[in-house]
């Protein structure tokens, strides 16, 4: 049977574009359909614009700290419109880069909504195409709980396009997106409250990291309200919002921002026309090769719900392209030791097991931990402290986990992730000469276990 394409990719996000480009490079006839924006969540309403806003939010501290170093530039003023305008231009530039990457790779780009008609057919805005393989890489979408007044709330999708910076913001959620945006709004000068229905945010991260970040965010004036949740949202006559909590309290705000989870983007995808099955949580079920229950259809990225991170989707896209069209170069994605960062202020960087995970897995561990005031702040009144922590297997000396809260934690942990991937032991850390004076050298000078 002949097909229009060897591979038809639905979704031009990080994973879909990676799979399409490399499949085309391996000689396959490839098409990509995208209904919204090139680059997916990461480029448009995720990692990239968020990191730009994090940079913007940190300047208030930079200006204040500069005074201790002899700099005086008058009173700093922030303009939201300038930041958002410049951010938009950068995203448009990146959209163009993604377009060029696809076109220059020989990929057919179709801008429109794609819908599955059967196991080998896709319709894009009335046009029908056939493909030997179809890859679903449609990503995820933020969700807001079904409460009265939820139409007054926003998510990360809308936050990047607000016309003005809200004066008072309620951020609802306890995951990394909630913590990052609470840091952003707080750093830019908004009166910010973070509400979370449990006793401490960032479930799944090391307990020491969670508690340390809680304390540091509190120092910066962020109002943290745990064991709290919103029951309803009402719009006031003056346009402000009144959020009634489940305990009866009412909090007033100009913006209620929800970061309470994401769902797979499967709307009107036509899965009912195929044999594709979903998991209990609504993600597309796949095997170790990203194969769905329909032999000709594959899926990757956020839509399969494994590890919802851009670099993971990129690795999955590469694996799919190689397995289908260059099998001699195929290597499965290794989901162990995936480094992660949270771009809160201060940042979190982490790789490997938490202390709790190591103990649950039966490891006898030694914990090395240090909390210190970074050198940059010693001339200032800023009392922010950095946390560095190593979780070490007491039996074979292997470093099981590395965790940090502090400036540029993600940059530091990326390098350590390579060492841990190579099986680094605590002895290897001890024998490594540090770069002085840096914060990073603390990881190779931790000598005495704290427990």
Swiss-Prot record:
The keyword Disulfide bond applies. Belongs to the class-I pyridine nucleotide-disulfide oxidoreductase family. The active site is at 436 (proton acceptor). NCBIfam families: PRK06116.1. Catalyzes the reduction of glutathione disulfide (GSSG) to reduced glutathione (GSH). Constitutes the major mechanism to maintain a high GSH:GSSG ratio in the cytosol. It is found in: Cytoplasm. It comes from Pseudomonas aeruginosa (strain ATCC 15692 / DSM 22644 / CIP 104116 / JCM 14847 / LMG 12228 / 1C / PRS 101 / PAO1). FAD binds at residues 14-15, 34, 41-42, 50, 114, 302, 310, 436. PROSITE patterns: PYRIDINE_REDOX_1. It catalyses: 2 glutathione + NADP(+) = glutathione disulfide + NADPH + H(+). InterPro entries: FAD/NAD-bd_sf (IPR036188), FAD/NAD-binding_dom (IPR023753), FAD/NAD-linked_Rdtase_dimer_sf (IPR016156), GSHR/TRXR-like (IPR046952), Pyr_nuc-diS_OxRdtase (IPR001100), Pyr_nucl-diS_OxRdtase_dimer (IPR004099), Pyr_OxRdtase_I_AS (IPR012999). Binds 1 FAD per subunit. Homodimer. It holds the Pfam family Pyr_redox_2. GO terms for cellular component: cytoplasm. The gene is gor. Glutathione binds at residues 14, 98. The active site is a redox-active disulfide bond. This is Glutathione reductase. NADP(+) binds at residues 174, 177, 180, 197, 203, 261, 341. Its EC number is 1.8.1.7.
